[in-house]
């Protein structure tokens, strides 16, 4: 039993021995590697796999399952490392990039291979060789783009193939030829393009009983998006329509702003759909080729994974030329697709477009400050509650506007924005709606409702859209007869639109020509054998159409009329230039109508036989209208022919592009408008040739005008705007309200006239004057303002009277105002308020200029004719001169009143429809031309009287005339030369006597004259200025009112007159005046300052340039460095002693020398008196000082009369007997004596000039007006004798002095004593006594 027991125990052990290896394999620890896998494959797991079909039992020893998923394998494991019995290999979720040839060679038992979710991009041919038993292959979610038939070699038993989720977009035919057992395939990708390139797949699948997975969905084109490929029909797989690419990128894709010299690369990537796929580059639509010298580097295109094509373009050195659009275009047989990017190249100094606000019919846009070369964008104003979706109103649409490289805004693009006006927006909706025979009549009735308010249209696009709709409705007239009446009503309503809007619509889209052309073709489209007559009446249009037989035609006469209540001729309905008020639909009896009769009856518009009606137009068609028919249309079987008549109440729908008639119709340079109704006659389908007899037309005028011309509307082509021409039309007769004409053409006929209220030409308004006007006006303004500024800045130094100063400045200012406003605003008719302001300003300035000339002529005439009686002792002083206010009230107030009344009555009197801004003709007669005629008459009378006065006794007897008028420059110089030889003391006596007799025989107030020009010269200058201004005004008026050659001639004459006027005013009043030239020189400082210890300057003799007879006044106190307190002394107006005379001369000479601060050059010697002769009492020019000086000179004249009667002795007695206190005299007394002192304040020739260290700080007192007038008087013979006696007395009392004479003057002369005294005064304040020892000072 023991032995048997042992045998029984050994039997199970023998049975377990064969299973021991399997148990060891299953129980082996994992630490030594994956279970059942070689130690070299650490990331894989191996396990046994039960064969299919076995429900239990032990797995077969040769079947292995190897799982290598998620192990980051870069490539499949070597087949030799895997178990020989491997039937399933899972390699998903790794990083395998490619499959080499023979990657799985040796795995002959492999039945399932899973390679999904890798990054496989290339599969080499033969990659699956050796897998003869493979039944399932999963290559989904990789990056495979190239698949060929060689790819799947060695898979004869493959049943299921999954290649979905890759990047291919199409498959080549025969790609599955190496898979004979294939039953199911899934090839859906995000780029799958179901087009003609996949058309082979559907029949191939049907023939092979291949099932396309339901997950195989189309991605492109968009029409088949998300549809299963297996459910499509073969016809749906086509390559028609726009090219759609699954990939098309351009880098950079957004606008780039770069600087000159930068480097910019471009890269373009697109779908590769075949060998014909190409990428081309364009710059501003021009092809781009590689050019290394120009900095353009273009690389060859590269193809990636048989799916993408890439091209690179590099700009290595960017210049300004690179600005614009750069475009990448993908081209193939199916079509082209492009991507663009804008490049803006900035210069080193880039400019900006200013911020600007634009308001138009699309909205209100505020464009910000934008860099030059940049296109700015603004969001459109959207209407979210718009019931009808518009193509241009989609969300996100924008308006664009480009700022050019010069920093100027270009016109913006607002086409993607909605209209702000409700009517325009609705009419635009009508245009976008599709029209067919079922809805045409409904849309037409709805559109007519909107056109009933055509008078309130405010946008030209309203007319454009209605015209487009009328053209669309014309195509359905043959089917819907009711459309004829609706179309005529809409055209009639559009004639109520403002004429300016009609003109703009015609210019924009030829809208008016479209409407007229549609109406002319209605008869031929609507008439048929069942409808042989059409008659439609409307407010402004009437239509009559007949279907006639040419062989039975005997002539036709039609008259267009209306009821008298609807439009009496005097009311002139619809005249151009006037906005008609909105009108409701008029009653039937107020509409235009036709009345036609056969034959040729006599019809007169003046005696129309229908009661309570007025005939507006008539046309008579001759019986021979169809006599020129071709033989094909001759009897015995005459075809039907359409004859249509139209009448338009006015010519609002007939606008040529320039709104003017052609030269043949109106003559050269004429502006004409339609003054009658327009009547049309035309045929359709008749082949009418040249007429053998003319068409007789009679038309009633609804507007006044001149020079009527018969014309017909010539339409050059279907798309042409057309225009009026008179070729073939002749005017037979013209009465005040009716014109008769004959025409050899069928068409639209009217009478053109020069209308008094011609509508303004919008396109030409503000276009400007002839170019010659502007530079000549600028020259005139330059001369006038130079004169004005000179006289204002140098008021005190220019020797003109107060009245003369005011009159000259006002005259220059008003001439400048007239010329400037004329040149700058006469053509600004586009802006109503500006045009009215220009007209009012021109009206005022023209009248005021002529009135100032008249005032100046009156003052000059008064100077020549009025003389005051010689004053006697005890006579009261003369009255103060009248103020200048009266002249301002006359020359400025009268024009202001006239212009104010004219504007208050009707402000529109200053805005006619003429092409310039001026008064309407009738109001201008009473408001301008008649006042101008009166002003000219009075002015010319003054001119004539003044001229006769100069040629009469005044010219023969100077003593009885205006003795105070100075001679001209040449005469003054000669007079000074004659007196210079009479000795130095002659000047003193002459000055005394001339001053004393200044009031004797004075012709007028002393301030009323000119110190340099004689009355004759002044009168000649005024007359010249007057007539040059009239010539300039007349030529300027003709230059804007005429056309063509007369306009050019008048513009040139205006330029000549304006230039001559400006140069004359400047030359006469500035350049030729010595005092003005001296003031100019005084404004320029000397080149180098005087030396600190310069030798004294010699004083010129008083008779050389500062002669008391012909000399100029002393320098002003402004030149003194001591200011207003520089001279504490004052001399009485009558107590002129020899001490005062000497001290006055020395002090003033010293002040003149010391006040300059530096010596003058020799060329300015003797011109010191030119500086500020009129500056009275410390630089103040007050009228009160003038009056005091006037009275002082009058009182001094009484004392000087004694010297005049007593000769030299009386003068000496007067000088030596009277005494006065220097310190106690009032200031006015000093002014009176200093103005009359001989040679006061002048440099004395031959004597040394005191240096600033030697002279005193006192200021020279200027001469008064009376003193200057007295110095300009000629010395009498007694004065000359007295001068000799005084000279002897001066030599007798002189002392021998040792003072050096720098200019070589002889010692012991006239002013030797004065020189000595001046040296003493330098230290004693002009109070040292040295010459007259008998003088006493109180």
UniProtKB/Swiss-Prot annotation:
InterPro entries: Adhesion_GPCR_A, Cys-rich_flank_reg_C, GAIN_B, GAIN_dom_sf, GPCR_2-like_7TM, GPCR_2_extracell_dom_sf, GPCR_2_extracellular_dom, GPCR_2_secretin-like. Glycosylated. Residues 710-759 are annotated as: GPS. Residues 247-344 form the Ig-like domain. Residues 565-591, 958-991, 1088-1126, 1150-1196, 1218-1309 are annotated as: Disordered. Residues 578-587, 1088-1098 have a biased composition (Pro residues). Residues 1168-1190 have a biased composition (Basic residues). Expressed in endothelial cells (at protein level). Abundantly expressed in heart, placenta, ovary, small intestine, and colon. PANTHER family: ADHESION G PROTEIN-COUPLED RECEPTOR A2, G-PROTEIN COUPLED RECEPTOR 124-LIKE PROTEIN. Endothelial receptor which functions together with RECK to enable brain endothelial cells to selectively respond to Wnt7 signals (WNT7A or WNT7B). Plays a key role in Wnt7-specific responses, such as endothelial cell sprouting and migration in the forebrain and neural tube, and establishment of the blood-brain barrier. Acts as a Wnt7-specific coactivator of canonical Wnt signaling: required to deliver RECK-bound Wnt7 to frizzled by assembling a higher-order RECK-ADGRA2-Fzd-LRP5-LRP6 complex. This is Adhesion G protein-coupled receptor A2.
